[in-house]
C-alpha cells in the first residue's frame, strides 16, 4: 500500500485527537480511557502525549488513518522497558496491513 508512516508531532495534534476519540468511541472496551474523559481534555493534553510518547501515525493520501502509541519508562533501572498503550486503524482500512506496518516500524 502507499501509506506514509511517521512519528506524530505537535502539528498533528488535531488529527491525533480526532483519531483517538474515534477509537475510543468505536471500541469502548478496548482502551483504558473513555471517550467522555478524553473529549473533555484540553488540546494541550494531547500535545503533551505526543511529546512524552512515541506515537506513530499511518497516513493515506495525507489523512491520518491509523496509529500506535508506545511509552518508554524513564527510571534509571527501567529505561529498557516500555509498553504499547494503544493501536487503532480506521475501519475501512482494517485488514489491509497497516497495523502490521505500524508495528514493524515501531519495533525497528
What role is predicted for each listed range?
Residues 96:
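Flexible nucleotide-binding loop
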